[in-house]
Amino acid sequence: MLLQPVWKGCRWTQFVRPIRRWNSTGTNRGVPFSFKDISNQEDITNISYPSSSDSVLTKSNGSSEVYKPKEEVVKYILHGKFTKNNTHLTFSSVVEDKNFHKNKGLTYNDTMLYYLNLPQKVKISLSTGCLGFRKAARGEYEAAFQTSGRMFELIKEKNMLNKDIEVVMDDFGKGRAAFISALVGKEGASVVKKVVKISDATKLKFGGVRSPKMRRL
């Protein structure tokens, strides 16, 4: 159950009261609840732009200029998460704002962090469940192979082969071998031509708590 904070003096106390529904007309001591509707949002993104008050830039001669983002796709990244129970594929675009340096009050660190790690926009997200596989079937080779083929079809349909593609793989489930087979096969013939880099993002364990005993049949 979602909870809301209670305001007492100048300190946020422990969450105690349940929050109302998002379309409720109730208020919190005169302050109305506000929720942003993202159901119609096309892209999932981590890009944040200046607010409307900071979007007006003042030049040295006294004239003002409205800041307008000018985004350009640098490359695409195809992420693959291959667990023992499922396969998740995400295709995202790395975008660069050509007018980012025009932000008001931008520090040197802000500029360096932005260009060192450019933001990404998720374009396509698929898993084996999206193709109708259920329960234990989601972790099988065939499910991952069909999901990979469907991902390559969507990339081609949406005309996202105009930039280089980087492939990032994570974990070592059955879907990893299926994804590679589909990529180098006829299913990924149009995509593999644009792949310029393949990397592994599997996390390595150093110490930590003891892992569960491996299941053997």
Curated annotation (Swiss-Prot):
The keyword Metal-binding does not apply. GO terms for cellular component: mitochondrial inner membrane; mitochondrial small ribosomal subunit; mitochondrion. GO terms for biological process: mitochondrial translation; translation. Keywords: Mitochondrion, Ribonucleoprotein, Ribosomal protein, Transit peptide. It is found in: Mitochondrion. It comes from the Eukaryota. Residues 1-59 form a transit peptide. GO terms for molecular function: structural constituent of ribosome. Signal peptide: none annotated. Component of the mitochondrial ribosome (mitoribosome), a dedicated translation machinery responsible for the synthesis of mitochondrial genome-encoded proteins, including at least some of the essential transmembrane subunits of the mitochondrial respiratory chain. The mitoribosomes are attached to the mitochondrial inner membrane and translation products are cotranslationally integrated into the membrane. Present with 5300 molecules/cell in log phase SD medium. Component of the mitochondrial small ribosomal subunit (mt-SSU). Mature yeast 74S mitochondrial ribosomes consist of a small (37S) and a large (54S) subunit. The 37S small subunit contains a 15S ribosomal RNA (15S mt-rRNA) and 34 different proteins. The 54S large subunit contains a 21S rRNA (21S mt-rRNA) and 46 different proteins. Belongs to the universal ribosomal protein uS11 family. HAMAP family: Ribosomal_uS11. This is Small ribosomal subunit protein uS11m.
